[in-house]
């Protein structure tokens, strides 16, 4: 997902210059990280020995730019099923798992949280998403701030209203 240039920009990709956007994969390779990018189950079996020797596994997860932004509502705002199953599969290897999440909305992460050692929620941050994400992963910067919205524990909690007048 986050190896795609368009996906990093989310619904902003219509206005962005994709030729100026690096993918997370590109930036990790520039940093000389020992990386493997399985794109199918066939490759998964071949990389298992390397994965078991890793210090940590970074999973880049998210939603397509086609389902985010204005006028793109979803009934279920959770990780897509295949991504949740992939997280569980990687967690079973016994290596630290870091989830990098790129979504255009808050999603319910209750099912995924127990299987992740850390979560870096990068939203759809635009043309410099990859550089800032990798800087955070390497500890060059400390990602901090206040969330602009609440995250639901489960989809059934939506919508969440606070400070609503009862009168």
Residue ranges of model-derived segments:
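C-terminal non-catalytic regions of proteins with extracellular/luminal or membrane-system context
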Residues: 1-167
